Amino acid sequence: MSFHSGFVCILGRPNAGKSTLLNALVGEKLAIISPKPQTTRNRILGILHLPNQKGRAGQVILIDTPGVHKPDSSLGRKMMVEVREALEGCNLILMMVDAARRRDTADEFVLDLAKQSGTPVFLLLNKIDLLRGKKPELLSQIEAYSKLHEFREVIPLSARKKDGVDLLLKKLIEALPEGPRYFPEDQITDQPARFMAAEVIREQVLLQTSEEVPYATTVIIDEYEESKKLIRIAATVYCEREGQKGILIGKRGEKLKAIGTAARLQIEKMTGTRVFLELFVKVRTGWRDSREFVDELDWRRQLENLTSSAKSVQR
């Protein structure tokens, strides 16, 4: 039996369905999802373990990336750094496009990035469930894209309904080289639970607020204490203006309570443990343009700081 493995980068414009595909492939909710563009701000690793089929077993390390865009803030630039770092050293790119919308310069920008990497590319035409009865339109898109690049595979699918996902898995394992098992079989991501909790809270902010508020907020976990029967979490939701703070808190604190309740239930489902969640809201004017603050939002940087603090205490 041969064992195949490799790193696969999921690339696409905002709202192409990248995070939905990651969750569908792994079978767990690793990436938050909302109808709002640029929901994903960091690259997220999803580890897919494939059992032996026809003499081949494998491990696919999927990398979900922020939506490709031309940045206009420190946050946007950091997101594009995440994209470019994900492309480095990957074995395969899954370029996702929204088949239900007309191709434009944003899709061409994504394709240019993929071409520059020199890595083999699968073209995934997502959201085909929205094209029922429009097969000529889908075939026309496939023909048009095929003239722009020599794709390794072209696969129409619906990540939301999991149509075409089995075919994608088959083609993935065929395309990846023989290699080692990079992660243990019981591991499905590299993200610590405390940082996944921050994303769950931010997801509820995205779902329960509108206009500029979702884009002007971020979440930092201040305390995360875990025991067998209870996880205690204290988190701060940062926004940029007092008016946004008022919206997040709501009348008599009702909005913040609703966000906290929904997030707590989701974290309990994720961890299988009862959760006590305490939320605070603070104003950090212009945080999206503060390179220092944006860098501190990186969970890998936060993990390094926590490790350093723990070592200092031990001394």
List the model feature ranges, each with a label:
Residues T119-P120, D129-T189:
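Canonical P-loop GTPase G-domain recognition
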